[in-house]
């Protein structure tokens, strides 16, 4: 038995998820979510929305996020009375602030200094996972299908897993076939940004506000024409693309805020449903994870759009929908530490197998 910690803050930026994972059983021992401090959250919002930050401010933010990730580790271990020396390594995703693979020079950047995390926790850290995939010819995202494949390794039927974070991504798993996956489009990011702008809330709990509005179908149809939705897979996208500025250029003065929220939820539901239906009726089970798995109104919309397909939370399998991505980065850290390459060729379009991440080691004294 080996213990690894995974750290994840997704494009929703709703906090740092920390998961203590037992391998090789993939058993989640404990998980917590630590909210970002107000200053860090404000600076992240400014950076991702394209507001001006100095280079010095970005460098400081990299260190500050590293400190907050380290504090999440300390809180996690304190709650269950586990000593840092018992942990083999931490897998830290960091906080994505930009990700674009559309040009001749693809790039991705996750903040959260690995040296800071390792020094403050006394635990070896693996970070900067996505850059290796980009260099290897891949899209750098999504990685979730790798871990979904582990969970459904004994699958006897075709299933789909959709992770609904800020960006939604899909995994298709079938017996005796290569696992496939890609980014679908906006998951929670537009709904979160819109409710924050109008109500000051971080997210629309259970989709209640969206349920009070009416879908603006001309707006929905216009949004669905965005070129990203019509790209062939593999494909990936960042939250900075599907931003409020992307939305607001399509809005009219007579649209009500609640109706816009209803339309944004419909956009997420329709793009997910279309992705599933394009699998030619093979899929009979759809499992949801990420924050969107708790959005009751979104799940109801998906069930309506996907007749004959059981739409479930991955919690029905005894797996936490909130900590699945953090668990994945704990697992990825173990692959890196043990020099085990991963195969993303059918997911990100990478040219071959690779060992992901950069290692920030700590010399343990016993």
From Swiss-Prot:
Keyword Membrane: no
BP GO terms, sorted: 1,6-anhydro-N-acetyl-beta-muramic acid catabolic process; amino sugar metabolic process; peptidoglycan turnover
KW ATP-binding (keyword) present: yes
Annotated ATP binding sites: 10-17
SUPFAM superfamilies: Actin-like ATPase domain (SSF53067)
Keyword terms: ATP-binding, Carbohydrate metabolism, Kinase, Nucleotide-binding, Transferase
GO molecular function, one term: phosphotransferase activity, alcohol group as acceptor
Pathway noted in the entry: Amino-sugar metabolism; 1,6-anhydro-N-acetylmuramate degradation; Cell wall biogenesis; peptidoglycan recycling
EC annotation from Swiss-Prot or TrEMBL: 2.7.1.170
Segments forming a coiled coil: none
EC top class, as a word: transferase
InterPro entries the record matches: Anhydro_N_Ac-Mur_kinase, ATPase_NBD
Reaction(s) catalysed (UniProt annotation): 1,6-anhydro-N-acetyl-beta-muramate + ATP + H2O = N-acetyl-D-muramate 6-phosphate + ADP + H(+)
Family note: Belongs to the anhydro-N-acetylmuramic acid kinase family.
Protein's job: Catalyzes the specific phosphorylation of 1,6-anhydro-N-acetylmuramic acid (anhMurNAc) with the simultaneous cleavage of the 1,6-anhydro ring, generating MurNAc-6-P. Is required for the utilization of anhMurNAc either imported from the medium or derived from its own cell wall murein, and thus plays a role in cell wall recycling.
Record protein name field: Anhydro-N-acetylmuramic acid kinase
Organism: Legionella pneumophila subsp. pneumophila (strain Philadelphia 1 / ATCC 33152 / DSM 7513)
């Amino acid at each position: 038995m080996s213990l690894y910690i995974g750290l994840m803050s997704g494009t929703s930026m709703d906090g740092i998820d920390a998961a203590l994972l037992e391998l090789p059983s993939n058993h989640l021992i404990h998980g917590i979510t630590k909210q970002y401090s107000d200053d860090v959250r404000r600076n992240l919002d400014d950076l991702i929305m394209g507001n001006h930050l100095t280079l010095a401010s970005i460098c400081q933010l990299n260190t500050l996020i590293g400190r907050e990730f380290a504090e999440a580790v300390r809180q996690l271990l304190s709650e269950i009375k586990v000593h840092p020396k018992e942990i083999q390594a931490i897998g830290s995703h960091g906080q994505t602030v930009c990700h674009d693979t559309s040009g001749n020079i693809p790039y991705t950047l996750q903040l959260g200094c690995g040296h800071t995390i390792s020094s403050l926790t006394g635990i070896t850290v693996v970070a900067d996972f996505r850059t290796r995939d980009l260099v290897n010819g891949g899209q750098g995202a999504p990685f979730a299908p790798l871990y979904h494949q582990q969970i459904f390794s004994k699958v006897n039927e075709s299933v789909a897993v959709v992770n609904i974070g800020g960006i939604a991504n899909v995994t298709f798993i079938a017996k005796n076939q290569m696992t496939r996956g890609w980014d679908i489009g906006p998951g929670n990011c537009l709904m979160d940004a819109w409710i924050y702008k109008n109500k000051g809330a971080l997210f629309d709990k259970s989709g209640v506000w969206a349920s009070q509005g009416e879908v603006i179908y001309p707006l929905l149809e216009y949004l669905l024409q965005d070129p990203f939705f019509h790209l062939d897979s593999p494909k990936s996208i960042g939250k900075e693309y599907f931003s409020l500025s992307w939305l607001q250029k399509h809005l009219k003065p007579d649209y009500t805020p609640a109706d816009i929220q209803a339309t944004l939820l419909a956009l997420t539901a329709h793009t997910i449903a279309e992705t599933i239906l394009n699998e030619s009726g093979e899929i009979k089970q759809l499992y949801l994870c990420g924050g969107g798995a708790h959005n009751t109104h979104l799940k109801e919309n998906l069930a309506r759009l996907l007749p004959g397909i059981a739409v479930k939370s991955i919690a029905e399998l005894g797996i936490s929908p909130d900590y699945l991505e953090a668990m994945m980065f704990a697992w990825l850290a173990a692959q890196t530490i043990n020099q085990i390459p991963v195969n993303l060729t059918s997911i990100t379009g990478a040219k071959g197998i690779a060992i992901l991440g950069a290692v920030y080691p700590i010399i343990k004294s016993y």
